[in-house]
Amino acid sequence: TGARMSSPSKRALGDVLAATRLRSSMDEALAHLGAYRPFLRAPAEMARLHAAHPSALSHTCDVARDSAFDLRLVAPRLPRTRVPGGHTPQTWLDHLAREGARERYGTREEHPGAWETIDRELGVIERLGFAGYFLIVKEIVDFCAARGILCQGRGSAANSAVCFCLGITAVDAVRHNLLFERFLSDARSGPPDIDVDIEACRREEVIQHVYELYGRERAAQVANVITYRPRSAMRDAARALGYPAGSAQAWARGKGQAPALVSEAAGALARLPRHMGIHSGGMVLTDQPVSRICPVGWAAMPGRTVLQWDKEDCADAGLVKFDLLSLGMLTALRIAFDELRASDAREDYVNPHLRGWAQRQVHGRHDQPVGLHTLPEEDPRVYDLLCAADTVGVFQVESRAQMNTLPRLKPRCFYDIVVEVALIRPGPIQGRSVNPYLRRRSGREEVTYLHPLLEPALRQTLGVPLFQEQLMRIATDAAGLSGARADQLRRAMGAKRSPERMEALKGDLMAGMEERGIDAPTRERIFEQLKGFADFGFPESHSFSFAHIVYASSWLKVHAPEHFYAAILASQPMGFYSPATLVQDARRHGVRVVGPSVNDSLVDASVQRMEGADTGEAYREGRAQSLPTRGVVPLDVDSDLAVCIGLSQVRGLGAAAERIVAARREGAFTSQADLARRAHVSSSDMEKLAMAGALECLGVGRREGAWAAGALAQPSARAGQWQPFLPGTEVGSTVPDLPSLSE
């Protein structure tokens, strides 16, 4: 239509947005805006303007009506999956799932219940025609496994025994009696939703693999609409109205009072779309060029293309999204497990507590390396660590809120971790479920149920509803609804609440409860309880997936603390705490931590065999946060090992860290000049190394090294340029007698 605004009253806001788009002030943008601002006219006004030709409006409506169509009719299909000869996607999926079932559950005679569940799930997948989707996700997971990239499926997919058998998820849905209908059912119209967490530092490898495998024209990342927040709205409004950038920045930070006109414009911009970003992990795959369906552009990051639609637009157009998400803790776990497996084979370099750990028997299956999904179960010392809230660096349970809750919850089994992960979330907190659960957990409140039929669904959470799956179980146990209908009820009551669908399902729910002898007042109370916690209930499957990572990171902290802390430091930035705080926590547990050294450190933090006394406060980079004063749980510390801080932890060093490690392969550095010559270290980088204490292995103190850095002129970051000598550091000048740098 060419309209720039919805009504003439929005002209000022439209001008501000236009000026923002042009990156200029409104005065400068007038030439582009013109005197007339087109806007959307109301039907009555259009009729008045076309009074001489009234048929124009009716003909326009006829054309619009005839042009309308259901986008699902032209929705693209998924790429054709590669299957062996003689197989269809469905038969190949059946084969892979049953092969995985034999490995995990044994024969049908040994575990008939598991096989019955798998057959039922495969039947649903076949009826919905989603076999190709599962095969694509499995191919991505298999690629990660082949490349040594740690990944794990999570979310509602953990409710599926088929996903467990395919190796997509680590949660045994049969063992934990999870609801498949929360993930997929015959009543679902859209595709399944499988989120795959991939270690953060290697996710790009997986994304590029998907592009290469399916073709760049047939794959693209989903966009994300970034909306205005108070600060960005204030900055853009001030710039559009011609105010200096310094004033705009100050007002955005709350320093000084912005003019009324600026504040009014900023308020109008709030929550409006500002620009397009990239979804955290969504990728779309199609059997035809994506550009035939929606516009595609190049992303700022090389090698990426991005749709100009967000995930809701993609869903409306029938595009299927795959979520490849990054998770920093998976990077840390992979680093720790890889190093432990390597050290297990070296007699002179292994924690004695872990001798032979890499070939332990797990679940009675054949020998395999212990890793994220194969750790010894229900280790009491892991729960001792959690009960003491000694969880700095541990995934998901290291926040202050989690640390305050853990000693009250006192987890002693894996399901307690599942509950802990779900408990400290905005939903349960807003739904006031946290304190009732903790009171019942400690015996200070009686465990009660609105009706005995609710007990099977709520028994594990002591009568306090926490999970979305519990809503579905209540609907099936107390009212006899099918799993598919129970999932429809959950969706109708969820965050995007549909009063119409909810009322339609309420009749079935109430009738079912009446048939089972539940009186009218109790029926109403049950319905209100369901409606109340549907908004905040956390997915139990999601909590199970994260609980595995909580357990693994806790296990590493207890049994391999040096590798745990080194891996966490090597995976920064992530988590709640700074590197300095993590170092402080390691030292208070008796773990040796030595500062960066140009002759000993790798690029990232590592575990090394060290002899002699602990260097104590050698690492001073950054400021540590205060840590809880409660008791410290004993860890399996190896006195012969130490965490060596990586050169990448030296603030601002950048690519010089890799050059130093590469040059050191020819031999240790003998002097500051030798380091500068062989590793091409600039004087500014040399100063950073000196101030971090990384030159002490050369017999050079921090002040002395910083002074001498000026005499070691090397090429600067810009090619072909040299840094000038600093005053007093020219060749031939002597270093004054400098005192040691104070704390």
Segment roles from a protein language model:
Residues T1, L73-P76, L375-P376, P596-S597:
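Acidic carboxylate-rich catalytic motifs and surrounding loops in phosphoryl-/glycosyl-chemistry enzymes
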Residues T1-S67, R72, T81, P89-T91:
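Alpha-helix N-cap/helix-start capping residues at coil-to-helix junctions, especially the first residue
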Residues A3-M5, R77, Q649:
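Active-site-proximal loop/turn and secondary-structure-junction residues that shape catalytic pockets
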Residues Y36-R37, G85-N351, R355, G364-E743:
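Noncatalytic, beta-rich nucleic-acid-contacting surfaces in large DNA/RNA-processing enzymes
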Residues R360:
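Cationic, low-complexity basic patches in intrinsically disordered or flexible, solvent-exposed regions
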